[in-house]
Amino acid sequence: MTTLFIADLHLSAERTDITDCFLHFMQQEARNIDALYVLGDLFEMWIGDDDDSPFLQQIKHAFKQLTDSGVPCYFIYGNRDFLIGSRFCQETGMTLLPEHTVIDLYGTPTLILHGDTLCIEDEDYLRYRKRVHNRFIQWLFFCLPLTYRQKVGDKIRSGSSKNNKEKTTSIMDVTPNEVVRLMAEQNVIDMIHGHTHRPDVHHIEVNGKAAIRTVLGDWYHHGSVLVCTPDGCKLETRDFSEKNQ
């Protein structure tokens, strides 16, 4: 009995090393598990479900093969792929979950999320997030031709990279009080999220109880997987060279 969690792969046609490692993971490791959870930023950028490039087709095919084999796959959007919609889910067999979801992880209620909503000190990002999650603005964006949306997406991506370099480390990390507040609100003592690219297991206290916050790693330099069984969870890495083994 195994459940796997991944996040922050930032898949793109340019990073074939990440894509190859991911496809190997899907074809080998994810085949005989209870469930796969993808906690956001699966893609470097998502400009609409109508983008059907050869690169995206192979990613969707990998998920479809897995779900057709009987492995349920769940997705929570991140700050790079929040425009993923129903068409993508239909084509892959994945289930789109609310941005804050409590699951039963082998008897333990566990809050899963991407993690960007925990960074409440990053006021510039929160203002940006509020704008791009506006349904009317999203409708206007989808009215644009796909090629123009690609240009807009590239501009947003380059601007985001520049802004992040100018921000302090503390602003870009989660706000501890917000973590405790949300866990107390959801009545859980276990949380799993990504977004910060700082894999670790944090032992904290929520309402006088010992609690655990597990942070998933990104896939920039190697694969990062949280492997959970009824006996517990462990953060593991997957070397890009494993695809050749």
UniProtKB/Swiss-Prot annotation:
Catalysed reaction, written as an equation: UDP-2-N,3-O-bis[(3R)-3-hydroxytetradecanoyl]-alpha-D-glucosamine + H2O = 2-N,3-O-bis[(3R)-3-hydroxytetradecanoyl]-alpha-D-glucosaminyl 1-phosphate + UMP + 2 H(+)
Cofactors that this protein relies on: Mn(2+)
Protein name per its UniProtKB record: UDP-2,3-diacylglucosamine hydrolase
MF terms (GO), sorted A to Z: manganese ion binding; UDP-2,3-diacylglucosamine hydrolase activity
Family label: Belongs to the LpxH family.
Binding note for cofactor: Binds 2 Mn(2+) ions per subunit in a binuclear metal center.
Pathway as given in its UniProt record: Glycolipid biosynthesis; lipid IV(A) biosynthesis; lipid IV(A) from (3R)-3-hydroxytetradecanoyl-[acyl-carrier-protein] and UDP-N-acetyl-alpha-D-glucosamine: step 4/6
UniProt GO BP: lipid A biosynthetic process
Bilayer topology annotation: Peripheral membrane protein
Superkingdom as given in the UniProt entry: Bacteria
SUPFAM superfamilies with a match to the protein in the record: Metallo-dependent phosphatases
Main function: Hydrolyzes the pyrophosphate bond of UDP-2,3-diacylglucosamine to yield 2,3-diacylglucosamine 1-phosphate (lipid X) and UMP by catalyzing the attack of water at the alpha-P atom. Involved in the biosynthesis of lipid A, a phosphorylated glycolipid that anchors the lipopolysaccharide to the outer membrane of the cell.
Binding residue positions for Mn(2+) 1: 8, 10, 41, 197
Record-listed substrate binding positions: 79-80, 122, 160, 164, 167, 195
Protein location: Cell inner membrane
Keywords, sorted A to Z: Cell inner membrane, Cell membrane, Hydrolase, Lipid A biosynthesis, Lipid biosynthesis, Lipid metabolism, Manganese, Membrane, Metal-binding
EC number(s) recorded for this UniProt protein: 3.6.1.54
Residues engaged in binding Mn(2+) 2: 41, 79, 114, 195
UniProt cross-references to Pfam families, sorted A to Z: Metallophos
InterPro entries assigned: Calcineurin-like_PHP_ApaH, LpxH-like, Metallo-depent_PP-like, UDP-diacylglucosamine_Hdrlase
GO cellular component, one term: extrinsic component of plasma membrane
